[in-house]
A protein has these predicted regions:
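Short, well-formed alpha-helical segments that are part of the catalytic scaffolds
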Residues: 7-30
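A conserved acidic beta->alpha catalytic loop
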Residues: 23, 27, 33-46, 63-64, ...
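Catalytic-site signature of metal-activated, phosphate-bearing donor transferases
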Residues: 68-76, 86-89, 94-221, 225, ...
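"A position-specific structural signal for the A-helix of alpha-solenoid helical repeats
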Residues: 205, 242, 277-280, 319-322, ...
Length: 371
């Protein structure tokens, strides 16, 4: 049966760390935790937790340099252990969520792939991330910030369905100054970097940092720089989608906003996020027939099984919500009521939205009765 070692770098994570460790406890046989300069109770929390649960562990202290350097150093310490078959790398604000049918012994007995990718849910979006990899595979991290795992081309990979990760480090958990600080780190990295791939990646995350820091004009410029680099279509799609959303937020001319959304959609026509946004944008501008067209087209698309930052709610109920409103705005109350009935049958519809859906259904019904 394969053994799994948890590898983490932490700093000032006392308030969130125990939740992460509790969630991953069923999987791990050993833990290597590297503290990079905490001035809170992080180290005490780690030591107490693993002693309480009788998990073999080592706690190291390291000077902070950057994310990839410190993660690679932590993995070097892990390599001192000869009894760990797989490394599992998590952040302190990750939570492992197991399916009800998960059998840890069966899972470990059947482990044979080099790398296991898990779905990550963060801030309403989903993507995949390698979370388990074979100890002797030679993986390492790159990137001063928003680091990523470099995996040998010959590695065999498998997508884990028995568990996924919930990341609690969404934009709302950090203030704007923190994101602008990240942007400063990335700007410095861009001045030093020469690798075209890393340059494209840094431009992408520079756009993300400025956007979340509230500097939309700099974010748009950074995302355009990412688009000019070419490459991975999913990253190009997200860059163009973010540009369109910020243009709408900054009240750019209507034709520019619509063109920006269409440009994003043309890169990944299997993605419905631009169509949802276009439907909502058209509704707000009282173009109800346009809204109906965009929402209807979006509803024809299945949620992709793989992709970068897939917005799950758009595919499960939000497009249908927009279609309800658009049909009503077009005066097609029968169609609006029928769509509303379908919406209320959706298990994914949050309780907070059901009242609004009921009101929409009542309004459509009253309109039909008055005809």
């Amino acid at each position: 049966m394969a053994s799994i070692g948890l590898c983490m770098i932490v700093r000032n994570a006392a308030s969130t760390l125990e939740r992460c460790l509790t969630s991953v406890l069923p999987l791990i046989d050993y833990a290597c935790i590297v503290d990079t300069g905490s001035d809170d109770e992080t180290v005490r929390v780690v030591r107490h937790f693993f002693q309480k649960h009788r998990i073999r562990h080592d706690i190291y202290r390291d000077t902070w340099r950057d994310f990839s350097s410190n993660r690679n150093a932590a993995m070097d310490w892990m390599r001192h252990r000869g009894d760990v078959d797989y490394y599992m790398v998590l952040a302190a604000d990750d939570v492992v969520c197991f399916s009800e049918a998960f059998d840890v012994h069966k899972f470990k007995e059947q482990m044979g792939f080099d790398v296991y990718d898990a779905q990550v849910h963060e801030d309403g979006a989903q993507c995949d991330r390698p979370v388990l990899f074979e100890a002797n595979l030679g993986c390492y991290y790159r990137g001063k910030i928003h680091e990523f795992l470099v995996i040998p081309a010959h590695a065999t990979r498998c997508e884990v369905t028995a568990f996924h990760l919930e990341s609690t480090r969404g934009p709302s958990d950090r203030d704007r100054a923190a994101y602008l600080s990240d942007a400063g780190v990335i700007e410095e990295a861009l001045r030093e970097e020469t690798d075209p791939f890393m340059l494209s990646r840094y431009h992408f995350y520079l756009g993300q940092s400025y956007m979340r820091g509230g500097d939309f004009k700099k974010a748009i410029k950074a995302f355009y720089a990412r688009v000019q680099c070419g490459g991975w279509e999913q990253e190009l799609f997200i860059s163009l989608l973010c540009i369109a959303r910020m243009m709408a937020g900054l009240n750019y001319r209507e034709e520019r906003v619509i063109h920006a959304y269409f440009r994003a959609w043309s890169v990944c026509p299997e993605r419905a996020e631009p169509l949802y946004d276009l439907a909502a944008y058209a509704r707000k501008n009282k173009h109800h027939h346009w809204a109906r067209l965009f929402a209807g087209k979006g509803m024809q698309l299945e949620k992709p099984t793989r992709g970068l930052r897939i917005e799950h709610d758009i595919y499960t109920y939000k497009l249908l919500e927009e279609y309800v409103n658009a049909a009503y705005g077009c005066g097609d109350y029968s169609e609006s009521l029928e769509a509303c009935t379908r919406l209320l049958k959706q298990a994914a519809l949050p309780a907070s939205e059901r009242g609004r859906a009921m009101t929409s259904a009542i309004n459509a019904l009253e309109r039909l009765r008055s005809v």
